[in-house]
Amino acid sequence: MLTAQDKQKIIKENQLAESDTGSPEVQVALLTARINDLQGHFEAHKKDNHSRRGLLRLVSQRRKLLDYLHDKDVERYRSLIKKLNIRR
């Protein structure tokens, strides 16, 4: 589970401007943190299919944001996947 401090740290690291909280970079970074957190959960709870469906929803949402960013600005897209270490 991400704490408020964790979220603020992620936002601070990925924001484009001082008040930026909704750019695709910030949203993808937050989703990536939640996805990584859930992956740790599934190591202990292999049969938790209800949460697995939520994980797939988060992955799909992140994929859509990454596709949007790729179409809008390829350089920002490449730097983001490199920074977050997302395979693609």
From Swiss-Prot:
Subunit record text: Part of the 30S ribosomal subunit. Forms a bridge to the 50S subunit in the 70S ribosome, contacting the 23S rRNA.
InterPro entries: Ribosomal_uS15, Ribosomal_uS15_bac-type, uS15_NS1_RNA-bd_sf
NCBIfam families in the cross-refs: S15_bact
Family: Belongs to the universal ribosomal protein uS15 family.
Domain of life of the native organism: Bacteria
GO molecular function: rRNA binding; structural constituent of ribosome
Cellular component GO terms held in the UniProt record: cytosolic small ribosomal subunit
UniProt xrefs under SMART domains: Ribosomal_S15
Function description: One of the primary rRNA binding proteins, it binds directly to 16S rRNA where it helps nucleate assembly of the platform of the 30S subunit by binding and bridging several RNA helices of the 16S rRNA. Forms an intersubunit bridge (bridge B4) with the 23S rRNA of the 50S subunit in the ribosome.
Keywords of the record: Ribonucleoprotein, Ribosomal protein, RNA-binding, rRNA-binding
This protein's name: Small ribosomal subunit protein uS15
